[in-house]
């Protein structure tokens, strides 16, 4: 893991411990792991310590000095007393009779190496602070339910971990057929109604919080030419909560792919526990040998945000898997897979690029 990423993780943990929030987040994680639903999260989100922790975490990010449509940045918050910061966040979220209304998001086009641009949405700094407050509380709840095969924008996970898992698939497991998937404009096309149901399925049943997340997704977008758009889909890149929401959307894909092979019911039937040194592990090898004699498709997923690969043992499985996954994404997530950019690669004959 790069030292920079490791330092950020350590800093986040140190900040959470300083404000006394780490035990709270740990408890949320374990309660979520036990299948508990959460109906009253707003008091925790708007607690003084969570707000001050959010400020500290945002300040550590260089992007906090980039102004939104109100021309303010983190320095405008830093000059205020802590109690004033906490009171203002609470007022922004709950003070209006119309509920929380985020200010317009500033749209900025970032050049890409291929000559195209990537749209970036920059919320106003106070709205970023609200998003960070929400993220800190719901992230441990979601982490308890996220797939082990997802590596992007998650605590203590990195690009290096995803690449290492990829090498394991190719070199140790001999899964040489790689399906390179491309979802057209993923962040701009996330279905809001579907996302709300997925958040609910995570165990987040606080209706006031879900209403606020809807408002964040519907925040007006101020375009470079000065016009304003009201989005009916998508979660803008640049929003603090957007990567977490993206993982919530695609976690359903992770779990479905795993259910087709890694966590298929036959694995539980034929797998068994065995002791290796001082630990107990669940051995799937016997189950997999039996499953390969059936018509099941052997497939494994490695995902980093919206960039993912599926690994298969032979071309026939790869062709069937490509068709099945494409149909599933279209029907269940209401997203479009690019037929031009999605392809099957035999890595023994051709190169497959993943995460650079």
Language-model features, listed with the residues they occupy:
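Intrinsically disordered, low-complexity and often Lys/Arg-enriched segments
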Residues: 1-33, 265-290
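Conserved pre-catalytic core of RNA-dependent polymerases
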Residues: 7, 15-240
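Conserved polymerase palm-domain catalytic core
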Residues: 104, 145-149, 154, 161-347, ...
């Amino acid at each position: 893991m790069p030292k920079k990423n490791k330092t950020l993780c350590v800093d986040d943990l140190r900040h959470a411990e300083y404000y006394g929030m780490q035990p709270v987040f740990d408890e949320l994680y374990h309660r979520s792991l036990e299948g508990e639903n959460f109906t009253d999260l707003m008091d925790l989100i708007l607690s003084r310590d969570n707000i001050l922790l959010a400020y500290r975490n945002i300040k550590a990010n260089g992007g906090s000095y980039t102004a939104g449509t109100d021309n303010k940045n983190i320095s405008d918050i830093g000059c205020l007393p802590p109690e004033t910061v906490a009171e203002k966040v609470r007022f922004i979220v709950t003070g209006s009779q119309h509920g929380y209304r985020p200010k317009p998001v500033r749209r900025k086009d970032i050049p890409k190496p291929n000559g195209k641009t990537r749209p970036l949405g920059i919320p106003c700094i106070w709205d970023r602070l609200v998003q960070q407050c929400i993220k800190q509380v719901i992230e441990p709840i979601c982490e308890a339910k996220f797939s082990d095969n997802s590596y992007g924008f998650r605590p203590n996970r990195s690009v290096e971990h995803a690449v290492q898992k990829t090498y394991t698939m190719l070199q140790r497991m001999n899964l040489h057929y790689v399906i390179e998937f491309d979802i057209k404009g993923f962040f701009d096309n996330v279905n809001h109604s579907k996302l709300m149901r997925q958040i609910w399925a995570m165990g987040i049943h606080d209706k006031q919080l879900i209403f606020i997340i809807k408002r964040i997704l519907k925040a007006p977008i101020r375009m470079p030419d000065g016009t304003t758009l009201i989005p009916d889909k998508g979660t803008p890149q640049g929003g603090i909560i957007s990567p977490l929401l993206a993982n919530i959307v695609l976690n359903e894909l992770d779990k479905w792919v795993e259910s087709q092979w890694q966590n298929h019911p036959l694995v539980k039937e034929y797998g068994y526990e065995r002791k290796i040194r001082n630990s107990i592990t669940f051995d799937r090898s016997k189950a997999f040998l039996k499953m390969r004699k059936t018509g099941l498709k052997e497939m494994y997923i490695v995902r980093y945000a919206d960039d993912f690969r599926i690994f298969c043992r032979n071309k026939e499985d790869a062709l069937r898997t490509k068709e099945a996954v494409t149909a599933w994404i279209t029907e269940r997530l209401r997203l479009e897979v690019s037929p031009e950019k999605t392809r099957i690669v035999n890595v023994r004959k051709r190169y497959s690029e993943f995460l650079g």
